[in-house]
UniProtKB/Swiss-Prot annotation:
Binds to 23S rRNA. Forms part of two intersubunit bridges in the 70S ribosome. Signal peptide: none annotated. PROSITE patterns: RIBOSOMAL_L14 (PS00049). Belongs to the universal ribosomal protein uL14 family. It comes from Buchnera aphidicola subsp. Cinara cedri (strain Cc). The keyword rRNA-binding applies. The keyword Cell inner membrane does not apply. This is Large ribosomal subunit protein uL14.
């Protein structure tokens, strides 16, 4: 459950380490984002010589949340942190070439097959 001002970890090798949500995309009054939703983020902390710089505003896909997600079989998947993957503004393809940590199957429904194929584990 990500809202404006939430700090997230970055789960790829784009060069960003921490980002802050500045907008939840998908409706003028939409307040929260869950796994698989696209958000607008500002880069708060980045490594030198990365693909993105501190202060840039980019799009990101939420891949892990502490609140988790409920499946139709009744199971619940929760994570230890809130994480996202930075994507291109137009194509919604990931900027990085590697994904760190597990992602959920719910990304498949949202058409993020590239993120699923790069992830080391799909829950």
């Amino acid at each position: 459950m990500i809202q404006v001002q939430t700090i997230l970890n970055v789960a790829d090798n784009s060069g960003a380490r921490l980002v802050m949500c500045i907008k939840v995309l998908g409706g003028s009054r939409r307040r929260y984002a869950n796994i698989g939703d696209i958000i607008k983020v500002a880069i708060k902390e980045a490594i030198p010589r990365g693909k993105v710089k501190k202060g840039e505003v980019v799009k990101a896909v939420v891949v892990r949340t502490k609140k988790g997600i409920r499946r139709t079989d009744g199971s619940m998947i929760c994570f230890d942190n809130n994480s996202c993957v930075i994507v291109h503004d137009t194509t919604n393809q990931p900027i990085g070439t590697r994904i760190f940590g597990p992602v959920t199957r719910e990304l498949r429904v949202e058409k993020f097959m590239k993120i699923i194929s790069l992830a080391p584990e799909v829950l």
